[in-house]
Each structure stands twice: as C-alpha cells, then as structure tokens.
Amino acid sequence: GKLNENENLEAVYEKCTPYKIEKYLKMDIPYKKIITTPESFPKIRKAARKLNINIYKEYFCLFDECEKLTQDVDYRRKISQPIYDFFQFEQKAFVSATPLEMSHPEFERQDFQLIRIVPDYDYKKDLELIVTNSYYKRLRIVLDNLKDSKHICIFFNVTDGIADLIGNLGVTDYKVFCSQQSVNKLKKRGLVNAYSQIDYPLAKYNFFTCRFYSALDIRIGRYKPDILMLTDLRIAQWTMIDPFTEAIQIQGRFRRKGNDDVTYNSLTHITTVNPNIHIRSNEEIRNRVEQFITNYNLLKGQQETDEFKKGAILEDMENMKYQDLIDERGEINPFSIDNLYNEERVRSYYQSADKLYQAFLGTGFFN
C-alpha cells in the first residue's frame, strides 16, 4: 500500500532480490526511502557494502512499531536482528503510537530521549467489551446484529480458528489476510480466498491475523467497516489482545478518508476469561532469568576454555530452558527478557472481566 503511493520508495521483503536493492541505491534521486521488514534488513546492509555506501552515516534509521520487538520476538526470532545495526546509525529513532518499556542498555548508553506527543483534542474511541462463557453463541448474536453491515473486519490471531469460524458460520463472501505460510495452510483446507497482501475491495467478512495487520494501512471505501476483536482462551492463549497496544493498533489500521475522523461504525471485543491463569510475578521472572544467565555464562566460559568438551557443552547450552533469550550472536537478548514480563502483564488482564475492563480504561484511549 505505502509503495504504491510513492514511486521513490523501495520495499524490501522476503522475495526482494539484492540486485533490485543495488539498482535502487544507484538511482539519481534527491532522497531515497527504503521500507523493510526486520528480517530482510541484512539484504540492505549487504547491497550497501557492495556499493561502498556507509548507510550508518548517509541514512536515517526509523524503527516503526517498535513494540513489536518485545511482543513478537518469541515467535519471530529474527525480528531483533537489525538492532546491532540500528545502534550504529548516527541518526535514528524508535517510534510507535503504542510503545512498550524497553530494557536494552544501549538506549541509556547512547542517551536516547523519550519524546511523548499528546494530542490536544479528544481522541478517545467507543469500544464494547463482551466477556462471555458462551463464546460462539455471543459471537453469532453480534454478527446477526451486524447483518446489514457491508464490511465486517474480524481480528483473530489463530488461523485454524478462522477456518473453523468460516465453516461454522457458513459464510461464502469472505477474505482472510495472513502470512503466506498460513495462506497455504488455509488453501489446503479449501479456503481459497486467503491472501498474504491486502486485496480490495473488502468482502462482507474479512479476517486478519496479528502477523498480517501490523503496520498495515486499510483503505476505507464507500462503506465504513464494523470491527470485531476475538479472544478465545479455550483455543489458544495467543488470541489475547493487549488493550494498551494491539487494540489501539487494530482500530488505527483504518485510515481516515478526507476530513472524516470516524473510520469505522463500531468496535467490539468478544472474549473469554480464565480465573485460574497462573501469573508469574516480576520477582519470579527476574530470579529465573538471572539463574539462566548465570548458568549460560558458566557454560559459555567452559566452552571457550575446554576444546575437548566444546560440542557437548554447546548441546547443553542449546537445551537450556531459556535458550530463546539468546540472540543469533550468542548474546542475551534484552527484548526476549522484556517479552517474558510483557506476556505476564497481558495474561493478568484475562483473569477476570473486571481486570480486563480496568485495563481498557487504563489505556486512556477507550470509552
């Protein structure tokens, strides 16, 4: 979407070739702007080095939707790879409408400043929160009340759950927007209207996974959509939606048309809760992480000094419980540690209807 609106942009993603990046970097235009996924950033670095371009001096690095490094690093291990490059840029910024606290020591070491922009107008949005034990029954009631809606946009972060919903509801006028891997999975189940890129016009029922809608701009056509956010803890805990980040980002995907500030008709979150969810305290997480780091560094030291046991020690390191906290350089990844705290924070909201309600109020964004 962003690429189509600006001919001077270059989008670097999974299928983009190094030759294409080099060709763009050689273009004789006053300003160059490259948009990339974190996973594809090494392609830019490689192309720049080949052309003897010092991107760290000549380019400004803007890391958008920066909370995703914390939120997604547990299943997108490569999302934080460019952080070493990021800190080498002379001009740089981490930005988001919904940032999370970050513990990476380099921010303090490089004297980063926290700048908060507060609107001087009323930006709060109305949201209906429905907490239920009769999940599908309530969902059917809500959808029945929206039967005259031209476009219903449903955000549900589990592909199999989306497939089941489409089957159970018997809908035919639908589109699913998700990763290419999920597209292939859905098509094997006979759901042919699945896309890895936004496809217009929107259908009556439009399903989005969280991996897809991040940083996406959804154009509003003639009719405004109704938005449903779904969380079903019986299916998967990763269907939880964080009121402080994801809920705000979801409604913000729909861009204003002209001077119209209202971009959708309604915003609803249907969810189950689980009072039996065990929440680790910050102290418990801190103790576990500190013990892991101690054990990891001990094994790492032995690996460096004992050549004969190197293979066995490496295997022990890879089998450690918190191995996911280690980045591709073998260093402790601060974003992975932040992820542990963040997940417990979000999980705590789903212990009761009141806790979730208070969380939505606490954002200062929703009525």
What are these regions (language model features)?
Residues 1-3, 34-38, 138-170:
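Conserved strand-helix element at the start of the C-terminal RecA-like helicase core
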Residues 38-41, 49-93:
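SF2 helicase catalytic motif II
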Residues 181-209:
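Conserved helicase ATPase core of P-loop NTP-dependent helicases/translocases
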Residues 97-145:
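Interdomain hinge/linker at the junction between the two RecA-like core domains of SF2 helicases
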Residues 6-49, 188-195:
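Inter-Walker segment of RecA-like/P-loop motor cores
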Residues 282, 287-367:
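The feature captures the C-terminal accessory region of ATP-dependent helicases
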Residues 234-263:
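Conserved SF2 helicase motif VI
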Residues 217-232:
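A short beta-strand element within the Helicase C-terminal
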